[in-house]
Amino acid sequence: MIHTRALSPALGVEVTGVENLLDETVISRCLEALTWRGVLLIRGLHLDDEAQLAFSRRLGTVLAPAGKEIFKISLDPAVQPSAEYLKSTFHWHIDDTTNEVPAKATMLTARHVAMTGGGTEFASTYAAFEALPEQEQKRYEQLRVVHSFEAAQRLTHPDPSEQEVAAWRRLRSHETSLVWQRRDGRRSLVIGATADHIVGMDPGESRAILDELLEWTAQERFRYTHEWAVDDVVIWDNTGMLHRALPYDPASRRTMHRTTIAGEEAWG
């Protein structure tokens, strides 16, 4: 029998008692939990890549070219050639803010974990927005934000070369509402490392607001910290959960296998 347990007051749920991961009831409960709790944890599944893909495909359409559905997250360039770019994931961020349609969800399975550190933190931008005073909610609903790859990379490379900046700027930026209201009526903040500036606002004031909102959302009451064990599976609502990796030894073998579920609704 399937059971669920809250991982923190505002977000996160652990699902236990799963015998057949592809069972329709299991899939339905997982999707429901993901919608209302944002982060879903299942332990001890021992998924290989094939099983992870099968599970991911039951949750939605896997967002990747055929044969490249599994993305390895590691700071070892021999494992992940893009390891240098992954250093920006130590900052709070939401994936796909520079795309027209964000990914619906992300799934990680832990293949190797760090001896110390290396956890993943999540913060609910739904809960953070709902806790704001009504006057502030109304103000922020009128604002729009430009997101860029460059903004995130400058956090880890504050003194980049001209070549690095040129490479970052070749990637698209995207403008979104600061507050995204979905078709189902739920509202969340679209903030994080990629948030470059608020449209039409003085740069100093813009940065102050974005930093204040990030600090507000990262409060403990809106946050869940996951300490990884091998074979843990964590799935999260990519559109409403900020996330970041916690520091760990770059020489660690920490490796996560990621699949991404395609979204169905464009940013506001």
Model regions and ranges:
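Non-heme Fe(II) oxygenase catalytic core, chiefly the N-lobe of the double-stranded beta-helix
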Residues: 2-233, 238-268
